[in-house]
């Protein structure tokens, strides 16, 4: 009985030793992987349209989007997301907001808080989020 227990203990110790070696090898391999810089700089484009009482200008729209993000989450998230209105068609009141991969959800969350431009009530409605500017322009009818 005692010898059977000794054999089981030795097998368990060997098994744990093998698992430990495999784990440490895998961990050392992961440390040598260089992070992909393209992922860090990946952009997201939010296609939106504006419902307003009268026509809205693109410059005013960018200011309101940035202020709504600042009011909702503060200066830190404003600097992280850095939203910019890339394209805005005043006739159809459609446009594209450019942001990064980290902050696009913060920008989406702050859009309903943009309620007024120069005394004019507005509502910014996001239609779609894409990863390429070409597809975003195609969605609003450019090129």
Swiss-Prot record:
Pfam families, per database record: RNase_P_Rpp14
GO molecular function: ribonuclease P activity
Alphabetical GO biological process terms: tRNA 5'-leader removal
Record keywords: Cytoplasm, Endonuclease, Hydrolase, Nuclease, tRNA processing
Annotated GO CC locations: cytoplasm; ribonuclease P complex
Compartment annotation: Cytoplasm
Record has Cytoplasm as a keyword: yes
Documented EC number(s): 3.1.26.5
InterPro entries: Pop5/Rpp14/Rnp2-like, Rnp2-like_sf
Catalytic activity: Endonucleolytic cleavage of RNA, removing 5'-extranucleotides from tRNA precursor
Description of how the protein assembles with itself and partners: Consists of a catalytic RNA component and at least 4-5 protein subunits.
Its job: Part of ribonuclease P, a protein complex that generates mature tRNA molecules by cleaving their 5'-ends.
Similarity-based family: Belongs to the eukaryotic/archaeal RNase P protein component 2 family.
Name of protein: Ribonuclease P protein component 2
Source organism: Saccharolobus islandicus (strain M.16.4 / Kamchatka #3) (Sulfolobus islandicus)
Lineage, opening ranks: Archaea, Thermoproteota, Thermoprotei, Sulfolobales, Sulfolobaceae
């Amino acid at each position: 009985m005692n010898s059977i227990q000794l054999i089981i203990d030795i097998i368990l110790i060997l098994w744990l030793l093998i698992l430990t070696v495999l784990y440490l090898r895998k961990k050392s391999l992961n440390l040598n992987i260089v992070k992909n810089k393209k992922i860090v700089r990946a952009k997201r484009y939010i296609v939106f349209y504006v419902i307003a009482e009268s026509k809205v200008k693109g410059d005013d729209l960018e200011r309101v989007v940035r202020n709504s993000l600042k009011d909702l989450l503060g200066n830190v998230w404003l600097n992280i997301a850095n939203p910019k209105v890339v394209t805005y068609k005043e006739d159809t009141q459609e446009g594209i907001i450019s942001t990064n991969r980290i902050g696009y959800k913060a920008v989406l969350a702050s859009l309903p808080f943009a309620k007024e431009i120069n005394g004019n009530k507005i509502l910014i409605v996001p239609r779609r989020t894409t990863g390429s500017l070409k597809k975003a322009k195609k969605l609003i009818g450019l090129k």
